[in-house]
C-alpha cells in the first residue's frame, strides 16, 4: 500500500504503479485500491505530535483497560476457588459411597447414579438430571460447577482453564492510533524529543546528526509514526498467555522487530480475541533483509520504495521495522484479516488496513518502560468490582413493627422475587438473616429457615428482637441480608438492604418492597462507595457509642406480694449477651443476691442455658421479707457464663435499690410503691465489680 502524497492529483482513488514490478513491489500490487492520501488533514501531513492532554486521555483509557482485565482475572479466580473448595470437601469415594455427601449407596442405601463427566457414583440428592438430550444424563454438583466455571470464564472458547492468569489478555501499549506505514527505505522526517521519557526510551544520537538530505532507516527505539509516543508495554502474564500463539512466528530479526505490533488503544477491548490469535489464513515468515534495503538503523542507502519512483514527493512516515520487508498490517489496525480499526480517530488514520494475505499478528516485544501502578485508593475500588453484578439481585418484601410497650421489634419476612441464581442449576437455596448495626454479632443475629431450589421464596416468618428501647431505635440500623445456603462450602451472599430504625414510628407497621443491593463486607473509604446508596457499608461504631462496651440486656420483673409477704423476682430473658466461649456463644445463667446478706436464703440462681446469647429463663424467686425492710435492701443481678473445670466467666450485671440511678432506681421505687403489681423493665448489663461465682 502506498503512503506517498500526490498533491497534484484530483482523483481520490488510485491504483499502484503499473510499471514493471520488481521483487519488492509484489506486496504493493496485492494492496489493491487505496484511499488517496491527499484527503488527509493538514495536521497529519505535517506530522504534528499528540498534545499532552491527548496523551493523558489515552493513558487513562489504557490504565482502565488494564485494571478491568485484572478485575476479570480476580473474578475468575473466585470461581475457581469455589470449585476447588467443593472438591476439597468431598466426603465419599465415589464407588460405594456418594462422592459428595458420603452417603451409603446400593441395596441398603440410597439410589445410585453415575456422573456423566467424572464417572463417579453419587446419590440422587447430590446429582442433577439434565434433559437436553434424548436420554437423561446425570451430573454431580462438582461437574456441574466445573461446567459453570468453564462457561462463565470463557474457558470453553479458548480451550483453556484459566487459574492464575487472564483468560485472554490484551497487549497494553502506551501508543496512540497512528498511520500505517509503507515499505522501508523511505526518508525519515526528524521528530522532536518525546516529552515522557518514562514511556519512551531515549533516541540515538545518530538521528540528530543526520542531514536533511540523508535517507536512513529508523532507529528501532524511535517511532515517528506514533507521534513520539512511547513503546508498547506488556505485562508478564500477557506474555505467558500469548506465547503459544507466537511460537511459530518470530519477528526478532537482528533485534529490529521490537515495534512491530501497533494496535490502537481504543480497540483493545473489542478485539481481544483477534489481537492475540494468529489469522486463520496461512502464516508467512518474513524474509530477511534484501540487499537494497537498510539492515541496520544507521544505514543510509535508499531502497526502491515509493520515494525512489517519485523523488519530488516526500513520504509521510518513516519505515518502522528495518529487519522485515513486510511488517504485519493486522496488528497496526487492531484487527485480523484486514478488518478495519473501528473506533480509531479518523484524523489519526491515513489508510485502511492491509490485505488478508499478509502475515498474521505478532506479539509486541517487552519494553523497558512501564506505567506506574494506580493509586492505592483506586486499587481498592477495583478490588470491589464484580463483573457479574450487572444482573439484578432481586427484590425483598418485608414489614417492620416497633412494639413500644413490650420493647420489641418485629420483622416479618414475607417473600423475595427474582433472586440472582447462585447454584449450577440456575436456582438458589435462599434464607434471610438480620443484624442490628452498629455492633453486628451472633448475639443480634436472627435468621429464617432455608427454602430449597427457588428464586422466588415465600417465608412469611416473623423474627422478633426483644429489649429494643427508644434509645436503640434512635441509633440502630437494621441490616437485612439474603444469602444462599451452600451444603458443601461457604454460604454465599446475594444482596442486602438497610433501614434506619429512627424512621420507624412506634406501634405502626410499615411495609417494604425493596430491591437488594450488593455490598462487599469490609470497611471502605467514603469516596469509594459513595454511589452505593443506602447499602453503603457503614463504619462499625462499637467503640464510639458512648465508649461503653455492650454486655447485653436482661428483662426483670418485680412484685411485692402482700398475700405471701415477700418479694417475687422474675428473670424472664436476656438478649445480646457478650460471647465468652471460643465458639462465639455462651452458656449463661443468672445469679440473684439480696443485700445486705441474709444468709443462704438471699442467693438464688437460674438454670444454665447452653450455647446461646439470647436465653429465655422465665423463672421466679421468692424472698421472705417485710415491706418496711425492703427499702433498705438492694438486689444484685449478675449474668455468668458456665464453664466446666474452671471458674465461670462474668458477663455483666446490674443492681436495683435505693442507691441505684436512672431506670434501676425507678424500677425499684415503682415496686415499693405498687404492691401486688408485677412491673417488668429492661436493664443494661455492665461490667461492674462482682464476686466470684460459686
From Swiss-Prot:
Protein name: Rabphilin-3A
Renumbered residue ranges of the record's region Disordered: 1-51, 166-388
Matches recorded under SMART domains: C2
Zinc finger (FYVE-type): 92-148
Polar residues composition-biased segments: 1-12
Residues found modified as Phosphoserine: 272, 692-693
Positions contributing to Zn(2+) 1 binding: 98, 101, 123, 126
RabBD domain mapped to chain residues: 44-160
Binding residues for Ca(2+) 1: 422-423, 484, 486, 492
Chain positions recorded as Zn(2+) 2 binding sites: 115, 118, 140, 143
One GO MF term: calcium ion binding
Species per Swiss-Prot/TrEMBL record: Homo sapiens
Domain C2, first and last residues per copy: 392-514, 550-683
Binding positions (Ca(2+) 4): 581, 641, 643, 649
Biased composition (Low complexity): 177-186, 352-370
Co-factor(s): Ca(2+)
Gene name for this UniProt entry: RPH3A
